[in-house]
Regions:
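Conserved structural motif at the start of ABC-family nucleotide-binding domains
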Residues: 11, 30-32
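Short beta-strand immediately N-terminal to the Walker A/P-loop
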Residues: 45-46, 89
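The feature captures the beta-strand-to-loop junction immediately N-terminal to the Walker
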Residues: 48-50
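Helix-to-loop junction immediately C-terminal to a conserved catalytic motif
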Residues: 63
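Conserved coupling/switch loops of ABC nucleotide-binding domains, chiefly the family-specific signature
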Residues: 69-72, 119
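Conserved ABC transporter NBD signature motif
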Residues: 71-82
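Beta-to-alpha transition at the N-cap of a short helix in the ABC ATPase nucleotide-binding domain
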Residues: 86, 92, 101-103
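Short helical segment in ABC ATPase nucleotide-binding domains corresponding to the A-loop/adjacent helical element
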Residues: 103-111, 121
Length: 122
């Protein structure tokens, strides 16, 4: 008999809130409230909704670019405390760095992982 390993959680949001302050004001904007879900390794998920509903905010928190105001975000069962070199995503809008060539934009992720320039070229 072969035992199957339990599916590994790729990303998990547990009771996540995100608030943004308005410049020059004490008012806050609630971008995400009590978000709880998990995605298993190999699972495909689509986050859809109208403009301004918090889709990009979730991606930013999942990648560690933005910290949640409350709750926990985990990637590969580890709490996200800052930018994660193993996480990348592409937004709907093309956000290439215009001062870099197409190849240099593609190589950027490898550079962040410490891959030598000679390896990037191959």
């Amino acid at each position: 008999m072969t035992l199957m390993a339990a599916p590994r959680t790729a990303i998990e949001f547990i009771g996540v809130d995100k608030r943004f302050g308005k410049p020059g004001s004490t008012a806050e904007v609630l971008a995400a409230r009590d978000v709880t879900f998990s995605v298993t390794t190999g699972e495909v998920v689509s986050i859809i909704g109208p403009s301004g509903c918090g889709k990009s905010t979730l991606l930013n928190m999942g990648s560690g670019l933005t910290k949640p105001s409350a709750g926990i975000v985990k990637v590969a069962d580890e709490v996200v405390n800052g930018p994660n070199k193993h996480v990348a995503f592409m937004l709907q809008k093309d956000l290439l760095m215009p001062w870099r060539t197409i190849a240099q934009n593609i190589e950027f992720g490898l550079e962040l992982r410490g891959v030598a320039a000679s390896e990037c070229q191959s």
